[in-house]
């Protein structure tokens, strides 16, 4: 089993190191991650300049390769030229903070898994609910459990999974739930600041609170102490509007 690891928090992030340690007994692990934090990068590719790949020489990251680009860059170049043999599985994470509801449209963590899926490799994104790295050991144990299940009982079709893990001690996690994406309220307003030169600067505001956290959603499952596993698809066609649009065009 050959597993490619990526993330969006950068190759020095604790979530990547513990994920690597947790999955190492399961097979050969290749790490190719961004040099810097690229949270919110979504599926962006770097097209205006060449990319470089480096290798960490010390610490727990020794042997990790990192790229001066986005999470999608990392997986793309890994699967389209950098690696001589393609991995059996792409795993992204463990992200610092949840990726639920509309978060999946912005998340670099989910984007890395999407790129693997687009290039024909089963892919999983792992995120830990709430900021901070509390109970990261528990999140790593959950990730290993999910990957072991994938290895032992592979799904019948190529898959793209989004996994969100409650920020709890392992013994307090109640189990696993198959979920759908919930929905958020719109994001909070931008935060404005005036710098010493008198220029106005803008910071993107916090994400909106959950609007649909009903039973069956990722928001509901994690709030109840369950690990949320959401199968994703990439077809954004609104099929319910096709007939109406066709009539509108006539």
Swiss-Prot record:
Record-level Gene Ontology MF annotations: 3'-nucleotidase activity; 5'-nucleotidase activity; exopolyphosphatase activity; metal ion binding; nucleotide binding
Disulfide pattern: none
Cofactor note: Binds 1 divalent metal cation per subunit.
Keywords: Cytoplasm, Hydrolase, Metal-binding, Nucleotide-binding
Signal sequence, renumbered to the chain: none
The keyword tRNA processing belongs to this UniProt entry's keyword annotation: no
UniProt keyword Hydrolase, yes or no: yes
Cellular component per GO, a single term: cytoplasm
Residues reported in the UniProt entry to bind a divalent metal cation: 8-9, 39, 95
Location relative to the cell: Cytoplasm
Cofactor(s), by name: a divalent metal cation
EC numbers: 3.1.3.5
Reaction(s) the record says it catalyses: a ribonucleoside 5'-phosphate + H2O = a ribonucleoside + phosphate
Chain's role: Nucleotidase that shows phosphatase activity on nucleoside 5'-monophosphates.
Alphabetized PANTHER family for the sequence: 5'-NUCLEOTIDASE SURE, 5'_3'-NUCLEOTIDASE SURE
Family of the protein in this entry: Belongs to the SurE nucleotidase family.
Protein name in the entry: 5'-nucleotidase SurE
The encoding gene: surE
